[in-house]
Amino acid sequence: MKIRGFEVVTKYKNAGINIPKRSTEHSAGYDIEAAETVSFAPGEIKLIPTGLKAYMQAGEVLYMYDRSSNPRKKGLVLINSVGVIDKDYYNNPDNEGHMFMQMRNFTDEEVVIEKGERVVQGVFMPFLVADGDENQEKEERTGGFGSTGA
């Protein structure tokens, strides 16, 4: 039985996508790479595809954190601060659960992220819910990136 991990989405099956791994024995985060080379104009915000989807158990979430070197070395920041990948994002009908990294170039120069370059770290975590949550009506996820917001 699979508990938690990463899989390559169908579109990138033959694209040489690496399954994320932890760099050291005590690393919390799994290094997630860019699935394609992406160029950013100064000030531009773009989605970088990972070619990956993540599966996990109920009560778990995958947080995607910016690598600490991105602002200093690349002039890029994860624009939403922390990416949140919910369990029901996996295999959603809109995009198969394909995860993207939303980055912004805050420099005055073009910045390029190369295919295979590590961009974010994914950390699986349990989460808690508030009292009365079980009594609140929930929607079923039907879309991909940004689909649960207005």
Swiss-Prot record:
Its annotated pathway reads: Pyrimidine metabolism; dUMP biosynthesis; dUMP from dCTP (dUTP route): step 2/2
Kindly indicate where the leader peptide sits in this chain: none
Q: What's its EC?
A: 3.6.1.23
Q: Which GO terms describe its molecular function?
A: dUTP diphosphatase activity; magnesium ion binding
Enumerate the transmembrane spans. Answer: none
Q: A Gene Ontology biological process annotation? A: dUTP catabolic process
UniProtKB keywords = Hydrolase, Magnesium, Metal-binding, Nucleotide metabolism
Is Signal one of the keywords? Answer: no
**Record InterPro entries:** dUTPase, dUTPase-like, dUTPase-like_sf, dUTPase_trimeric
Cofactor(s) listed = Mg(2+)
Q: Which Pfam families match?
A: dUTPase
Q: Which amino acids does the record list as binding substrate?
A: 67-69, 80, 84-86
Q: Which reaction does it catalyse?
A: dUTP + H2O = dUMP + diphosphate + H(+)
Q: What does this protein do?
A: This enzyme is involved in nucleotide metabolism: it produces dUMP, the immediate precursor of thymidine nucleotides and it decreases the intracellular concentration of dUTP so that uracil cannot be incorporated into DNA.
NCBIfam families per the record?
dut (TIGR00576), PRK13956.1 (NF010561)
The text of the family note is:
Belongs to the dUTPase family.
What name has this protein been given in UniProt? Deoxyuridine 5'-triphosphate nucleotidohydrolase
Q: Which organism is it from?
A: Lactococcus lactis subsp. lactis (strain IL1403)
